[in-house]
């Protein structure tokens, strides 16, 4: 069984036991979180939401919080001596999907 959930402005396909990286959420490590925005549930029977599936939830356990690799944003204009360098590290949360309730 799998499901498509929406979290952090993104849609993610998840299965039970899968480890996924999502946008940072406000939860402590080891805490259980519930995702209510389930858009699709697949398996032997298929449930499609309009826009979400009624009564369907996905529970997950927070493993850790972290920051991704640094990306460099560099602005440059030729012949004008204009250079701007800025770095950014996006925070994330690693969760393990425990159960899909459909």
Curated annotation (Swiss-Prot):
GO terms, biological process: translation
Superkingdom, natural source: Bacteria
Pfam families in the record: Ribosomal_L21p (PF00829)
Alphabetic keyword roster: Ribonucleoprotein, Ribosomal protein, RNA-binding, rRNA-binding
One GO cellular component term noted in the UniProt record for this chain: ribonucleoprotein complex
InterPro entries: bL21-like, bL21-like_sf, Ribosomal_bL21, Ribosomal_bL21_CS
GO MF assignments: rRNA binding; structural constituent of ribosome
Sequence similarity: Belongs to the bacterial ribosomal protein bL21 family.
Protein purpose: This protein binds to 23S rRNA in the presence of protein L20.
Oligomeric form and interacting partners: Part of the 50S ribosomal subunit. Contacts protein L20.
Protein name (database record): Large ribosomal subunit protein bL21
Taxonomic lineage from the root: Bacteria, Bacillati, Bacillota, Bacilli, Bacillales
Originating gene: rplU
């Amino acid at each position: 069984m799998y499901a498509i959930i929406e979290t952090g402005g993104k849609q993610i396909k998840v299965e039970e036991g899968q480890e996924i990286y999502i946008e940072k959420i406000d939860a402590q490590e080891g805490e259980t979180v519930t995702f209510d925005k389930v858009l699709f549930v697949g398996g032997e029977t298929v449930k499609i939401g309009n826009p979400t599936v009624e009564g369907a939830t996905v529970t997950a356990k927070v493993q850790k919080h972290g920051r991704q690799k640094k990306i460099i944003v560099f602005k440059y204009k030729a012949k004008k001596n204009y250079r701007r360098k800025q770095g950014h590290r996006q925070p994330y949360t690693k969760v393990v999907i425990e159960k899909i309730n459909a």
